[in-house]
Amino acid sequence: MAPSSGGGNNGDVTATDNIMNTVGDAERSLFQICVTLRLRLSGVPGFEETVIEEEQDAEEELDPVSLLWRTFRKGFPLILLFNTLKPDDPIELPNSGVRQDKKGKASAFKFVKACIDKLGFDADNCFIMLDLYGDDTTGFVKVVRVVSSVLDLLIKANLIEDMRTSAPDVAYADKSLKRTQQQHIINELVTTERTYVQHLELLQRFKDLVVQKNVIPGDAVHDIFHNLDQILNFQRRFLIRVEQINKQDDTEQNWGKLFVNWMTNFQVYEPYIANQKRCQRTVDAEFNKLKGAGGSNEMRQMVENNASLYGFLMKPFQRLSKYPLLLGDLIKKGDMDAEKTADLEAGKAAATQVLSLTNEAVGREERVLAVEELKTRVEDWKGHRVEQFGELMLYGTFTVVKSEAIATGKDAERQVGTAPARA
C-alpha cells in the first residue's frame, strides 16, 4: 500500500470539461486539510496532548499548518502514530546516545523507514527529511499525505475512531446564513484565492510530469515555468494567512494590513511575470510535445490548445491584477469604520504598487530581449562592444532624417535605443 499521490484519468477530454472555470474546493486547501488532520489525529491516544503542548509553547498564535508542522518536527509524535498500529516490533525512540537536537530527525527517519519497510509505502511517495525540516510547503504536503495514509490504516483496522464523523458541518451551517456585502466580497477573496492556489498546484504537477518524462529540454522547462515553485510556496502561505483571518470575527478582520505586511513577499512574482514573452514563445515552439505529455484529465484539459495552457501560465498576473479590485470593493461596499477603511486604502495602495513593480520588471525584460535581438541583426558593430553600452533604457521605431535624405527628399525609418552614458 502507498500514500495516494493523485491518480490520472485516461478518459477523453469532453466538451463539457472546463478546468479554467472550476471553483477551488475548500477541503483541498492546506489550511483546511490541516484542520481536518488535527481532528483525525485527536483519535490517536496521546497525540492531542502533544499538539496542545506545542500550541502553548509557541510565542505567538499558530495557524493549523504551522502547528502540525512544528509538532511533526519533534519526531516522537510520528513514532507514537506508527506504534498505534500495534506492530509486532514497534519503533523505539532514539537512545540516549543521540544528541537532543538530533532526536527529532532520528525519530522522523525511523518513521519513514518503517512506513516503507513495514507498511509497503512507495518510497517515491514518502517524504524525505528536507520535506519536514525545510521551509517549502510542497514538501510539507508530502508529510501530510503520509500521515493521512497511516491514519487511514488505523481507521480501517478499527484501532481508532474516525473523528470526522462526529464533527459538526460548519460549512453547511454557514450557507444558511444571509451574508452582508462585506461578507460576500470577503467570500469571493477567499474562494478565488483557494481556486488560484489549486490551479498553481495543477501547473506544478504538470511541470513535474514534463520533467519526469523528459518531454522537453530543461532550458525549455525553465523558460515556460520559471520560478513557479517559489510562487506556489509563497501563495500557499498567503492563503493560510487569508484563511486564518477569515476565521476571525468580522470586527477583528483587517484585510488592508494583510496586504501591507505581505507586500515585499510579492516580489517573487517579478521574474515570473517578466518572463511572459519568453514563456509564450517557448509554449508555441514546444506545444505539440506538451500536449502529448499525458497525465490526469485536468492536465489534458489544460493543454487542449495553446491558449488554454498559456491562460493557466498567466494566472499569476491575473491574480495580482485582481487584488486591488477586491480591496476597492471592500472600501466602497464593506461598510468599514474609518480606521479599517484607512487600512484598506493602504492595502490597496500596496497591492497596486506590487502590480506596478511587476510591470516595470516586464519592461526591463523586454529591453533585454530587444538587445538580444539586436545582436543577431547587426552584422558589423564597427569595433564597438555591446556589453559596454550599459542597460538599454528606451527603444522604439522612429523616423531619422539624415543630410543625404534631405537632398533626396526621402526619410529613413530606424530603430533607435538609448543607454546610460559610460564614463
Language-model region placement:
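An all-alpha helical bundle fold corresponding to the catalytic cores
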Residues: 1-387
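Structured beta-rich ligand-binding regulatory domains in large eukaryotic signaling proteins
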Residues: 389-423
